[in-house]
A protein has these predicted regions:
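N-terminal secretory signal peptides that target proteins for export/translocation
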Residues: 1-5
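Short, structured coil segments at secondary-structure junctions
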Residues: 92, 123, 143-144, 238, ...
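Metallo-beta-lactamase
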Residues: 29, 129-174, 180-181, 235, ...
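Active-site neighborhood of phospho(di)ester-bond hydrolases with catalytic His/Asp-centered motifs
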Residues: 75-78, 99-107, 128-131, 186-190, ...
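Zn-dependent metallo-beta-lactamase
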Residues: 7-70, 153-166, 268
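Active-site metal-binding motif and surrounding structural segment of the metallo-beta-lactamase
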Residues: 83-128, 203-213, 232-235
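Cap/insert and terminal regions of metallo-dependent hydrolase folds
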Residues: 114-117, 184, 190-273
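Conserved beta-strand hairpin/beta-sheet module of binuclear metal-dependent hydrolase folds
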Residues: 43-91, 173-188
């Protein structure tokens, strides 16, 4: 049967409509690119967090994010409890067997707790962690047949994906920086060394605009005055989008949300962020 001309595009229109509905239902944020057809999409899925975004996932103190669409598939941090990490992996249909690299931001249990369970599921990975970690950590990684790689300074771990290198004094920590066509995307664990210091380090590595920063900012003890100074630094550094979560603090998250308005990205377990044209 041939459709008459007024209706011949109806199946295509309906397909697009239902695709958009499905995407919204899954809780993803897609950055519009003016109608371009992206060859590849950079995709971030929050697997572990103490805030809920997608129903059916479990919350707990900690952070983990799966990064897909780069040259390598990367798991950034692994949360606290292996069983909760694996529950959310199942609900979100994340495939840990496709992970090539695991980045551990710092040596706190709410970021390392699910690592060895993840390695048991997929040992064919390289684990990047700060050089200050105790030697036993690397030995445990290697005992599970994975490759252990310490990090002390900025390094490119795959095409367009960088680590800041170990930062901080009492608590050593690293963050992840991706050079995307929209600008730098920065993923943080807890930002013990100071979120503004991380942003500046990222700009030192790649002198490009900061498109998005998300993760834990560790600001719960900051006063309103201090927060205004931090937000002013974000604006001075021309950060376009912000997604504060995990250890940032509820009041502090509210201030970021107010300051960034529609450019604030709400975070939580099951949150999916997509950056096209990568």
């Amino acid at each position: 049967m041939t459709l008459s001309s007024p209706f011949k595009f109806l199946p295509f229109v309906l397909a697009v409509f239902f695709s958009v509905v499905l995407l919204k239902a899954r809780g993803s944020l897609t950055v519009e690119t003016g109608g371009a057809s992206p060859e590849r999409t950079l995709r971030f899925t929050v697997l572990y967090n103490n805030y809920l975004y997608e129903k059916g996932t479990k919350t707990d103190w900690g952070f983990s994010c799966l990064i897909e669409g780069a040259e390598k598939t990367i798991l950034f941090d692994t949360g606290t409890q292996p069983q909760i990490l694996m529950h959310n992996v199942g609900v979100l249909k994340a495939d840990l067997k496709k992970v090539d690299q695991i980045v551990i931001s710092h040596n706190h249990g709410d970021h390392t707790g699910g690592l060895f369970a993840a390695l048991e599921r997929n040992p064919n990975v390289t684990v990047f962690f700060p050089v200050s970690f105790p030697p036993e950590f690397g030995r445990r990684v290697e005992n599970l047949k994975a490759k252990a790689q310490t990090v002390d300074k900025p390094v490119e771990i795959c095409r367009n994906v960088y680590l800041t290198g170990e930062m901080g004094d009492a608590i050593k920590e690293q963050s992840l920086v991706i050079d995307s066509p929209k600008g730098l995307v920065i993923v943080t664990g807890c930002s013990h060394q100071g979120i503004v210091s991380i942003l500046r380090r990222a700009k030192e590595i790649l002198d490009k605009p900061i498109y998005l920063v998300f993760g834990g900012f560790h600001l719960g003890n900051k006063s309103d005055t201090e927060m205004q100074e931090i937000i002013a630094a974000f604006k001075e550094l021309k950060v376009e989008k912000c997604g504060a979560t995990h250890c940032t603090g509820d009041a502090q998250i509210a201030m970021f949300k107010k300051a960034f308005g529609e450019n604030y990205v709400t975070m939580g377990t099951g949150r999916i962020i997509e950056v096209p044209d990568f």
